[in-house]
Amino acid sequence: MSEIQLTQVPSFRRGFRFQWEPAQNCHVLLYPEGMIKLNESAAAVLTEVDGTRTVGAIVADLQARYPEAEGIQEDIVAFLEVAVERFWIELR
């Protein structure tokens, strides 16, 4: 897989829906075959994915929201790489 660029725009793949699930008391990613429960960090990143904003814009917003988090850009990019590998999101 190629390295994620800050200029790329992530979006959820067809069939995937991100939402808060009260019964699980967490954000989840729903897809036809099931559901993925997300931790707070994953939910914070995926909340920013809207199909219009770049990876760089998402990183900047999360850096502003969590200024004490060192290495946040690397963590966000690494998570997005996993999300692409698992076919949750796609990049354009």
UniProtKB/Swiss-Prot annotation:
Gene Ontology BP terms: pyrroloquinoline quinone biosynthetic process
Membrane spanning stretches: none
Sorted UniProt keywords: PQQ biosynthesis
Record pathway: Cofactor biosynthesis; pyrroloquinoline quinone biosynthesis
The keyword Endoplasmic reticulum belongs to this UniProt entry's keyword annotation: no
Record GO terms (molecular function): quinone binding
InterPro entries reported in the protein's UniProt record: PQQD (IPR008792), PqqD_bac (IPR022479), PqqD_sf (IPR041881)
Gene3D superfamilies: Coenzyme PQQ synthesis protein D (PqqD) (1.10.10.1150)
Listed NCBIfam families: PQQ_PqqD (TIGR03859), PRK02079.1 (NF002535)
Function noted in UniProt: Functions as a PqqA binding protein and presents PqqA to PqqE, in the pyrroloquinoline quinone (PQQ) biosynthetic pathway.
Subunit organization: Monomer. Interacts with PqqE.
Family: Belongs to the PqqD family.
UniProt name for this protein: PqqA binding protein
UniProt organism field: Stutzerimonas stutzeri (strain A1501) (Pseudomonas stutzeri)
High-level lineage: Bacteria, Pseudomonadati, Pseudomonadota, Gammaproteobacteria, Pseudomonadales
